[in-house]
């Protein structure tokens, strides 16, 4: 019988919180009691000492020194002074021993209450999101797509004219693709919800409650030892007091930590309230296609998306596995440290280890959460991998209706498709972008005058920076900044004057801020007055403000942003639209998941560190970073046209070749600039370029980029995250990245552009692509591609890096081709 089996229900959580509050009140009462005992012992010892001093004033010397009374009294007064010292020592021992330990125990108990409440709430929120909200959203979308598919099917079957039938067929194919893809997402979501449900009720929640009970029992054991130590120190030798203390000692000895909560559990324990596990809702199939419930659909429409999903899930599983490994190492290390410290710690000092025990329990809980995430991804990977392995090297099965239509295709159409990507392949590569979602933006904000903005938004306010750092920031006489005093709740105006930094404390009285003379309702108004009037800060100093020293322009507060809706997802987290509160600038906000390990968060910030140094019209602009608290944000300009790959697939049919030449010229200009800065992008592709509303292309996604003085970067760690079909042979074989390897990727980007967003090597796996390229194979010329551009592609794909053109040459060549093209 324990917390994990008897208190899994929400009612159990409530009574646990009530119990924690009651125990904290009890501990506070004990602390006040002990503090009063220390105070009374000190006062009593002081009175005895004062009596001894009074007697030493000579009253006893009136009697002969040889008098027995005099000697007895002298001994009495001497022993009284000894008793005074003993009582004073007892009081100090009580204060530094039991009372200090009890205060530490109370702080740890308060922290445990807070940590438990936060972890319980987080587990419930994650369960509700995975098990209810996400599933309901997927089901709602499923029903809508099923209705659309059924309607498109009826229109297709009812169409009589060839033109109408072809148009209805296209719509039906698109609806089928979307339905099958969403069916797969729903299957994966149901599997993830099932695993999360199982882990929550069998591992996560019981583990949390088991950890809580272990810590409570450990605290009960520590409290027992504190009380025993208190009674030993405060015990006196009188028979009456000894009897009382024996009773109290017996009461303290009756404390049994392992049985402390048995009565509580008998009174409040209840059966676990486990809701039914989610299952595939077969009613979703009533209006749509005859799909198998709980089974992935793998056919010619979904094979690419299933392969991509498997790659994505495999990457996420690798990150999750790494997280499990790290947390297992952390738990093992903490357990070993705790064992070593227990061996070297006196039993009465166990309270000193309580903080580490809580850290260990939190690490164990974190390990269970990581194992749950790993299990969900493992289950999804197995579903996807089993389906693809069952397919084998053969072609994916056709959709029955499309197979019938394919038999009726005329021989002339087949000849027209010879040497080109099949119509179905083009359809699949274009269809993902046909219904590109349009995202909304947060509304404009009312702009606030600079002087009316709060203190933390002022450019000259630097927060709690060290005083030593101020001297480095103040360069010229009259330079100033405002900072928060370290260790004190007051603000300081620091100014460089006559070669020395001067620091003036800003006085605050009656909600007015001043140095000398007139007061102002805010510090920004005070600084504005001193700047505009050039009034000396104080008559004695004669210091005048001249120039504000701004803080690092890249540092933003989370409060500086107004987040809009999610517009995408990256390797590290979600991407949102947003605005800057200061001037309504539209921004894109990349977030970093809080659960990522520190090394991955450092890789996330690598993009910002690189972009800080660059300014070019064809490089996406960095606006700032938010690192003051979690989650970490990278704030960049919002390029509203979206990514280049989706743009090609949705708008490509109406684009002229000259426009495409202008856009790849933009890409070449941006890469020429990066080449001049010795920056290696390593992930150049259409998906990582952005398009403005005026069709200007910008290079983006610098998460894999590196800056090397010699222009060569040697990578290690395998190919898990390498985009194989875009990567040069020397980078795949030897991990050698350079501007020349970026040139190879640029050749693939050219091919993507003039094939209007088709996938390179569409019928080859990553390994087959590597073997094909090593044997001298290259992509064919796209239908829309000018011959001069294809020759440039072939130069970019030279096997030897030294034989590839530089980006400067590529840019000049594209400009020349564009001028010649009509």
Swiss-Prot record:
Keywords (A to Z) from UniProt: ATP-binding, Cell junction, Cell membrane, Coiled coil, Cytoplasm, Cytoplasmic vesicle, Cytoskeleton, Golgi apparatus, Kinase, Lipid-binding, Membrane, Nucleotide-binding, Phosphoprotein, Proto-oncogene, SH2 domain, Transferase, Tumor suppressor, Tyrosine-protein kinase
The record places domain Protein kinase at: 561-822
Q: Where is this region: Important for interaction with membranes containing phosphoinositides?
A: 1-300
Provide the reaction this enzyme catalyses.
L-tyrosyl-[protein] + ATP = O-phospho-L-tyrosyl-[protein] + ADP + H(+)
Q: Which Gene3D superfamilies match?
A: Arfaptin homology (AH) domain/BAR domain, HR1 repeat, Phosphorylase Kinase, domain 1, SH2 domain, Transferase(Phosphotransferase) domain 1
Impact when changing residue 145 to P: Constitutively activated kinase that can act as oncogene. Promotes myeloid cell survival and proliferation
Impact after mutating residue 706 to Q: Negligible effect on autophosphorylation and kinase activity
Task: Locate the Phosphothreonine modifications and list their residues.
Answer: 421
Q: Which residues carry this modification: Phosphotyrosine?
A: 261, 713
Identify residues that carry Phosphoserine: 64, 67, 408, 411, 716
Q: Which residues form the F-BAR domain?
A: 1-260
Family note: Belongs to the protein kinase superfamily. Tyr protein kinase family. Fes/fps subfamily.
What is the name attached to this protein's record?
A: Tyrosine-protein kinase Fes/Fps
Organism from which the protein derives: Homo sapiens
